[in-house]
């Protein structure tokens, strides 16, 4: 008889079935199920090793080591789960103490790591505290020691740790597919809308409900084409309504009916967009933030498609709020899909372009995405007439073909973009990696490869983990057709839907990488940064081919990360001139914000990296106060020829006391008030840099905004 000596000194007879229960719990924690053959092997392995020791009493620590040995042979991931759980009581106390400390800070000080959250609100505080717990659980039960150390030191950054194991990142949601024929949401059946105003209401419900089930940006692609059929239904209704009360003998009744119907539909458009803007900027999602929603538009050329686009642009330009104090809202972010053939001089939708230009010159939005210029995004549109809208502020999907998957089956195969999503991003801190290679006298590419492989492994495990989720976790997406192939049963696992989805390798601080390499900025040189980005592309292409996973290169929009990476660099390598001597690092491949260069120079300099970040990118230039609409138009058209996704940067300011509006204002020149609302570009999206004198932004980002010259 063999006895196991437990931690408290008591004895317990050895029983292989207790091992089965313990390893099954460890497997369940990573959503794995053992086969009977694997269970039999574990029991046999453990029993043989126990009796081979020739002892009648075995300490529990030795028993744990035996079980770990069995699990390492069957499934190393379960072995890690078992190992992590062994000392969970001690670890859990430390973890909860850490969460409690952070929760007190959130409750009484607030949190400015995400400009899209208002941490003064109770619901937001609760969400932020839960996120801290979820983040600790992710680190404890998903990450290995090397990954934890790499994150702690700052060589990599795993985005959205608080939600990565619950759901997916950003998406192009197929709202049109969900609306068609009706759908079920929250156990209630929604009929397909019969009018435009109802379509707006239902679309708003869909967005608020579904955006809360993910953690990244939520895009409604080509919204003008989605809503146009419902505008037609409203139009038909209003024509019939008018004629119903018209005498047949009235001259011009039909023309009057058409005029009446068009006016009524336009009013539905205006009120619908106003409702959407109010809903998205005042009703927080269940995540505790305001849903980060983007709509793309502009390619529709029918009367109602153009009306829907122009209506949103004019509603956004005019702003929301009380009379004399109107200001533009932050959501939805608007992206204009520009095609020179229809938006150029004399084009069928030139009026839509002019409305967009007028809106951009006053509110910064819309941003502009070229469908007719150079490069990957435009080529997909020109060849297939398929639009790659940005997911959220800047993420773009790789092509996935209807029949061939990663590669077209034949010349007739077409790519699918709408309904797809990204499963998460992990970013490289390139200056840190170069500094490490130098401090250890190792080849830079050798060290870089180590972290690229680390990110690769994280993505593969994330795919496996998410694949075990059930469709019921996001029913509108997985069961009602919001995602590509999303007609599963609630009890089905979502693994079959993951193949066409992307996973991102992010890059930050390319400018600081070049500075650390030879003391020159991207403006002065940039060749080493360019070579590094090409190398990363080549390696990720190899991973993609070997793993059958759509990996993508992403120009990371560092928000709070821009300050964190400086802190991490200084801790390891100190303060280095033009690398870590400011409170922030540069975003992705952008020139440093303090560079005194023209908008055209900035467009050209950043263009070197454009096609090397096809998984996520944006180009923007800052316009001085004296810039007029004509200058903005010239630069937008130039960006469209170059194939860019272009943003207009202005520093908008509004006096909350007298209503005066002026660019770059810190004190109102009319009434002397400092009670201002200021809107600046955070990264790819806009944010309040001041609200009633306070800011939602972190100190590092505010320092960056203060130094902007050419951003």
Model feature map: region roles:
Residues 24, 47, 456, 460, ...:
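Amphipathic, well-packed alpha-helical segments that form the structural scaffold of globular domains
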Residues 15, 33, 666, 684-685:
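Conformational switch/transducer regions in large eukaryotic molecular machines and scaffolds
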Residues 92, 98-499, 520-522, 526-681, ...:
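Conserved catalytic cores of very large enzyme subunits
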Residues 691-700:
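Conserved helix-adjacent loop modules within structured domains
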Residues 503-516, 534:
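Contiguous, well-ordered alpha-helical segments that form the cores/surfaces of helical PPI scaffolds
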Residues 13-14, 500-504:
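Short, conserved micro-motifs enriched in small and acidic residues
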Residues 1-107, 701-706, 711:
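Charged, amphipathic alpha-helical regulatory modules used
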């Amino acid at each position: 008889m063999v006895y196991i000596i437990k931690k408290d000194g008591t004895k317990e007879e050895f029983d292989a079935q207790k091992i089965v229960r313990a390893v099954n719990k460890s497997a369940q924690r990573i959503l794995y199920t053992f086969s009977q053959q694997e269970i039999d092997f574990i029991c046999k392995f453990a029993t043989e090793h126990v009796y081979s020791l020739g002892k009648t009493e075995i300490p529990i620590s030795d028993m744990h080591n035996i079980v770990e040995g069995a699990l390492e042979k069957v499934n190393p991931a379960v072995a890690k789960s078992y190992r992590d759980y062994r000392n969970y009581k001690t670890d859990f106390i430390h973890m909860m103490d850490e969460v409690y400390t952070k929760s007190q800070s959130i409750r009484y000080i607030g949190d400015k790591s995400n400009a899209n959250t208002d941490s003064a609100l109770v619901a937001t505080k609760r969400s932020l505290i839960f996120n801290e717990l979820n983040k600790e659980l992710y680190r404890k039960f998903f990450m290995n020691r090397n990954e934890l150390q790499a994150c702690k030191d700052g060589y990599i950054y795993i985005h959205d740790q608080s939600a990565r194991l619950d759901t997916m990142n950003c998406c192009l949601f197929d709202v049109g597919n969900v609306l068609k024929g009706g759908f079920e949401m929250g156990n209630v059946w929604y009929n397909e809308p019969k009018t435009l105003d109802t379509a707006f209401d239902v679309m708003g419900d869909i967005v608020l409900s579904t955006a809360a089930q993910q953690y990244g940006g939520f895009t409604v692609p080509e919204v003008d084409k989605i809503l146009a059929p419902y505008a037609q239904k409203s139009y038909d209704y209003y024509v019939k309504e008018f004629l119903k009360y018209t005498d047949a003998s009235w001259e011009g009744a039909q023309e009057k009916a058409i005029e009446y119907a068009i006016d009524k539909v336009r009013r539905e458009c205006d009120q619908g967009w106003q409702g959407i803007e109010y809903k998205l900027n005042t009703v927080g999602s269940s995540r505790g933030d305001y849903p980060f929603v983007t709509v793309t538009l502009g390619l529709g050329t029918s009367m109602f498609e153009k009306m829907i686009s122009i209506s949103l642009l004019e509603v956004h330009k005019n702003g929301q709020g009380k009379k004399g104090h109107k200001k533009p809202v932050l959501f939805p972010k608007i992206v204009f899909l520009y095609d020179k053939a229809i938006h150029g001089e004399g084009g069928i939708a030139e009026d839509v372009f002019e409305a967009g230009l007028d809106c951009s010159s006053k509110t910064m939005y819309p941003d502009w995405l070229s469908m007719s210029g150079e490069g990957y995004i435009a080529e997909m549109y020109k060849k297939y007439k398929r639009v790659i809208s940005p997911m959220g502020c800047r993420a773009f999907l790789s092509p996935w073909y209807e029949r061939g998957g990663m590669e077209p089956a034949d010349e007739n195969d077409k790519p699918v973009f709408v309904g797809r999503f990204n499963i998460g991003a992990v970013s490289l801190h390139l200056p840190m990696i170069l500094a490490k290679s130098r401090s250890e006298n190792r080849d830079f590419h050798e060290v870089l490869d180590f972290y690229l492989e680390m990110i690769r492994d994280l993505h593969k495990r994330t795919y496996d983990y998410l694949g075990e989720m059930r469709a019921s976790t996001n029913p509108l997406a997985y069961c009602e057709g919001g995602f590509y192939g999303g007609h599963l049963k609630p009890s089905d696992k979502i693994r079959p839907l993951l193949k066409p989805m992307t996973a991102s390798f992010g890059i930050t601080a390319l400018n600081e990488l070049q500075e650390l390499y030879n003391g020159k900025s991207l403006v002065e040189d940039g060749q080493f940064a360019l070579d590094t980005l090409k190398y990363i592309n080549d390696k990720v292409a190899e991973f993609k081919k070997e793993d059958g996973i759509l990996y993508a290169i992403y120009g990371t929009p560092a928000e709070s990360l821009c300050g964190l990476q400086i802190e991490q660099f200084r801790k390891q390598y100190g303060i280095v001139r033009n690398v870590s001597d400011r409170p922030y690092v540069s975003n992705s491949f952008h020139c440093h914000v303090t560079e005194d260069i023209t908008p055209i120079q900035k467009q050209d300099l950043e263009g070197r990296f454009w096609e090397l970040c096809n998984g996520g990118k944006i180009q923007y230039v800052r316009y001085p106060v004296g810039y007029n609409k004509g200058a903005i138009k010239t630069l937008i058209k130039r960006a469209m020829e170059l194939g860019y996704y272009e943003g207009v940067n202005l520093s908008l300011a509004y006096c909350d006391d007298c209503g005066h509006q002026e660019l770059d204002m810190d004190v109102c020149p009319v009434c002397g008030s400092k009670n201002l609302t200021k809107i600046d570009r955070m990264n790819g999206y806009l944010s309040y840099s001041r609200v009633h004198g306070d800011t939602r932004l972190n100190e590092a980002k505010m320092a960056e905004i203060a130094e902007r010259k050419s951003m």
